[in-house]
Amino acid sequence: MIKYQSTRDSGEVKSAAGAIIQGIAEGKGLFVPCEIPKLPFDVEDMKGKSYKEIAKAVIGAFFDDYSGEEIKSCVDGAYTDKFESEDVVPVVKVGKANILELYHGRTAAFKDMALSILPYLLTAPKIGRASCRERV
């Protein structure tokens, strides 16, 4: 299982669910992975995939204490019918550059991408069990 440590105290280690529940580490640091996992897919295979398909694959790789069904439920709940664009994050070509439009959420700000999924991750069935285990 991937563990997360505080940026200010490497001795403070949590599971993904524990880090999500706690939010900010005891010493006011952020939780980051102790090691970056090897992605279980080839990045080239993500070409042409939807935002939700990519989100499920990437989040599943980093939050391995959630089941595949929990990740799917969280991503679908967070990103279905909540953005102006069905693509969630449209990519627009401007000259030779490809630009991600991160302003199609409820507040028209990039934070909608991360914060839309947070309540779903907090209330996923497994996280309730993780919360109880970590408090005991």
Task: List PLM regions with ranges.
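PLP-dependent amino-acid enzyme catalytic core
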Residues: 1-135
